[in-house]
């Protein structure tokens, strides 16, 4: 395997961590049909014990949810393409990340990353829509924790998804070890003008790939 192939794997693994993402949500109380949890912002949210009308907001959230549960439990997805098109095709409704759009599908749980506008989240909560905000992961370990967190909310198993991630990471590390004496300089720049600086997901993946991040 060439050095060029090794470096190209960065993009694949970075996208895996960005698009999928420890401890589960803190349980506060259980009434049978619902229970209270504390989300990533410290807000106490009442959620169903086994949500059946989930709306994941953002393509990355859709990737996680549709990899964990059957599409029949997903009330709607967004309008931006994700990485699970076959599962998404089985979800009939498409919505925007607004309170009005959410009301049209009557979700019993909306999952959103913490980069979403607090105002939009507040509007949904004001309409009595249960919204759980999770912290966007920036490292592989945080990604695993986020998957575990969401799986707990959905009353689903994350074992298969985590095992798949571990297998991919093992392949990458085995490949990187073949060139352990070399530390090429690499950089990440997205179409949105984002760079993978110190503390970013890209920076974390550079450690697995045994390369040096120029922007760190």
Label each residue range with its predicted role:
Residues 111-114, 133-137, 154, 187-199:
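Short beta-strand->loop
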Residues 78-83, 198-216:
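Alpha-helical, coiled-coil/dimerization segments enriched in small aliphatic residues
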Residues 6, 21-60, 156-186:
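Bacterial Sec-exported substrate-binding components of ABC uptake systems
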Residues 2-11:
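Bacterial N-terminal signal peptides that target proteins for export
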Residues 53-105, 109-114:
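A short, structured surface patch at a secondary-structure boundary
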């Amino acid at each position: 395997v060439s050095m060029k192939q090794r470096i190209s794997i960065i993009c694949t693994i970075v996208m895996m961590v960005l698009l999928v993402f420890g401890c589960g949500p803190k349980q506060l109380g259980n009434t049978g049909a619902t229970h209270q949890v504390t989300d990533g912002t410290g807000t106490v949210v009442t959620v169903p014990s086994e949500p059946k009308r989930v709306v994941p907001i953002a393509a990355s959230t859709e990737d996680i949810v549709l990899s964990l549960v059957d599409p029949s439990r997903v009330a709607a997805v967004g309008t931006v393409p994700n990485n699970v098109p076959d599962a998404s095709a089985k979800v009939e409704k498409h919505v925007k990340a607004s309170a009005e759009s959410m009301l049209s599908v009557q979700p019993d749980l909306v999952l959103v990353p913490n980069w979403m506008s607090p105002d939009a989240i507040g509007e949904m909560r004001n309409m009595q829509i249960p919204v759980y905000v999770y912290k966007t992961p920036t490292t592989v370990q945080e990604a695993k924790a986020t998957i575990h967190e969401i799986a707990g909310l959905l009353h689903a198993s994350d074992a298969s998804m985590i095992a798949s991630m571990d297998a991919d990471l093992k392949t990458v590390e085995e490949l990187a070890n073949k060139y352990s004496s070399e530390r090429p300089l690499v950089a990440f720049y997205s179409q949105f003008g984002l760079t993978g600086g110190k503390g970013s997901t890209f920076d974390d993946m550079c450690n697995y790939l045994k390369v040096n991040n120029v922007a760190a």
